Amino acid sequence: MPTAVEDKDAIHEVLAEYCFRLDDGRFVEMAALFTEDGTWDTAFGKATGRAAIAELASSLRQRGEQPRPRAVHLVTNIAITLDGDRASVRSNWMVMQSSPQGPRIGSGGACLDEMVRSGTSWRLRYRKIDRFIVP
């Protein structure tokens, strides 16, 4: 059985991979970080199930500014509460974007996550994204 430190480290890895996959436009791979019946609840829509999550993420990318500026999602202030094979996670996030004037904060906010252990890995069961820093 993993230690609490190992579980928290694994959860940090999931959150980092989420950002990398989202930034790279690998939405099917991003959705794979959720449970089969996971929910992605954003300011722009809510989706349940991996296919629906990937579809929503893709549609949001297409809807945004074109050509799309290079963006990097950052997650910080991660607080994890473990309860056996479940975890509650709070974090802050920010999107940094390139612009002709230089780097800028595109948006930011907070995430509330419910995660579950799935075999030997952790998955997002529910991710609520609050967006309160807007351009």
What positions do the PLM features span?
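Short, low-complexity N-terminal intrinsically disordered segments enriched in polar/charged residues
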Residues: 1-32
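Residue-level detector of alpha-helix boundaries and kinks
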Residues: 2-3, 15, 38, 65, ...
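Charge-dense, low-complexity intrinsically disordered segments
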Residues: 5, 47, 102
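A solvent-exposed, acidic/Ser-Thr-rich amphipathic alpha-helical stretch
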Residues: 27-93
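A beta-strand edge to alpha-helix "cap/lid" segment located at domain peripheries
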Residues: 63-135
